[in-house]
Amino acid sequence: MVDSKLTIADRSFSSRLIMGTGGAGNLAVLEEALIASGTELTTVAIRRVDAEGGTGLLDLLNRLGITPLPNTAGCRGAAEAVLTAQLAREALNTNWIKLEVIADERTLLPDAVELVRAAEQLVDDGFVVLPYTNDDPVLARRLEDAGCAAVMPLGSPIGTGLGITNPHNIEMIVAGAGVPVVLDAGIGTASDAALAMELGCDAVLLATAVTRAGDPAAMAAAMSAAVTAGYLARRAGRIPKRFWAQASSPPR
């Protein structure tokens, strides 16, 4: 039996679905969704924790046995992201950080130059860095070379629900990566999550697709099943695509 655990740096997780917390209507709805998802690792925007105290969310994650993964959401440059990561380390007593360095508010796309700069500084400072990046195989390689513990390419821009708009690039990132690849951003529904795993990703990170769904808990359960199905399909090996039909049973 193939080991189904997700291993990043020195930690292993039974679930390959990483959840975000943004967009949830309230903590009760979020709790139901987190339980249904089976996630063991959930992102927390450190700015929101600072601004709102964050005790309710952090207490919820602690009660559910879910590891919080602080992120630098909203940061617009390397210096700001590094400072936010350092604050997160002090506040949550963890050296894990989901690194986000955004170029602008309209697209929410990563700023490649500032992202690599921040990643290098944080790795040197002892962080386990998980960077949110563009679907660019070259940039993914640069981030891995900088010492990142995983690379997290987007499927499409944050919150768009467009799914994976450039699957070939995701496949190229997977083929060239020596660290786990986590599809991050753009997931709209369960089939998108399954496709990410079929393309070879090691995990999927999503938030909006669940927190803003009509029934967040039901969608979380669907996403969990989709990630598992996609992972198993990838391991099983799909049949090759053919131009012409081929009978499944030999002719008499």
Swiss-Prot record:
EC id: 2.8.1.10
Principal location class:
cytoplasm
**Gene Ontology terms, MF aspect:** thiazole synthase activity
Which reactions does this protein catalyse? [ThiS sulfur-carrier protein]-C-terminal-Gly-aminoethanethioate + 2-iminoacetate + 1-deoxy-D-xylulose 5-phosphate = [ThiS sulfur-carrier protein]-C-terminal Gly-Gly + 2-[(2R,5Z)-2-carboxy-4-methylthiazol-5(2H)-ylidene]ethyl phosphate + 2 H2O + H(+)
Please describe the quaternary structure of this protein.
Homotetramer. Forms heterodimers with either ThiH or ThiS.
Protein name listed in UniProt: Thiazole synthase
Q: Where in the cell is it found?
A: Cytoplasm
Task: Identify the keywords attached in UniProt to this record, alphabetized.
Answer: Cytoplasm, Schiff base, Thiamine biosynthesis, Transferase
> What's in the GO CC field?
cytoplasm
> Has UniProt tagged this entry with the keyword Transferase?
yes
- Residue positions annotated to bind 1-deoxy-D-xylulose 5-phosphate are 159, 185-186, 207-208
Q: Which organism is it from?
A: Mycobacterium avium (strain 104)
Q: Which residues form the active site?
A: 98 (schiff-base intermediate with dxp)
- What family is it from? Belongs to the ThiG family.
Metabolic or biological pathway: Cofactor biosynthesis; thiamine diphosphate biosynthesis
Mention one GO biological process in which this protein takes part, according to its record. thiamine diphosphate biosynthetic process
Q: What does this protein do?
A: Catalyzes the rearrangement of 1-deoxy-D-xylulose 5-phosphate (DXP) to produce the thiazole phosphate moiety of thiamine. Sulfur is provided by the thiocarboxylate moiety of the carrier protein ThiS. In vitro, sulfur can be provided by H(2)S.
